Amino acid sequence: MSSRVLTPDVVGIDALIHDHQTVLAKAEGGVVAVFANNAPAFYAVTPARLAELLALEEKLARPGSDVALDDQLYQEPQAAPVAVPMGKFAMYPDWQPDTDFIRQAALWGVALREPVTAEELASFIAYWQAEGKVFHHVQWQQKLARSLQIGRASNGGLPKRDVNTVSEPDSQIPPGFRG
């Protein structure tokens, strides 16, 4: 099991039990990580450092300002939902995925890091308009999610190479080969 030690000072539990005052006095920052059986067990903290940490926690718990903002500043009007055709429909030029498309795609097993770009959406719509197939709105979104997943992964996430550039050979000799 991996763990993270949050101080550079580390001591065994036996050394702490033997002379805890000396160990804590030598500790940088007033904190020592105590290990038992080669694993971190707990932290020993000097009273002064503990007082500093508690004061800091109290300070951070208080609001940074006494200015109270009006709640109406946070109540944004709900966006009017886009009218989605009922039932199955053929792809049309103004089709848009739902606003929570990325979340829905994650539910379908497609992890999208960035939202769909205008170019990707235009390409998808143009392809499926020409096909003339009909699907429900959710099915169109699922097709878009899969299309984005395949399209973005096809080149390992790298931008497409310019076919007009002349490639340059690598002049390095790999280890184990003679030149």
UniProtKB/Swiss-Prot annotation:
GO terms for biological process: DNA replication, synthesis of primer. The keyword DNA-binding applies. Residues 154-179 are annotated as: Disordered. It comes from the Bacteria. It holds the Pfam family DnaT. Keywords: DNA replication, DNA-binding, Primosome. GO terms for cellular component: primosome complex. NCBIfam families: PRK02854.1. Involved in the restart of stalled replication forks, which reloads the replicative helicase on sites other than the origin of replication. Can function in multiple replication restart pathways. Displaces ssDNA from a PriB-ssDNA complex. Probably forms a spiral filament on ssDNA. HAMAP family: DnaT (MF_01061). Homooligomerizes. Interacts with PriB. Component of the replication restart primosome. Primosome assembly occurs via a 'hand-off' mechanism. PriA binds to replication forks, subsequently PriB then DnaT bind; DnaT then displaces ssDNA to generate the helicase loading substrate. Belongs to the DnaT family. This is Replication restart protein DnaT. The gene is dnaT.
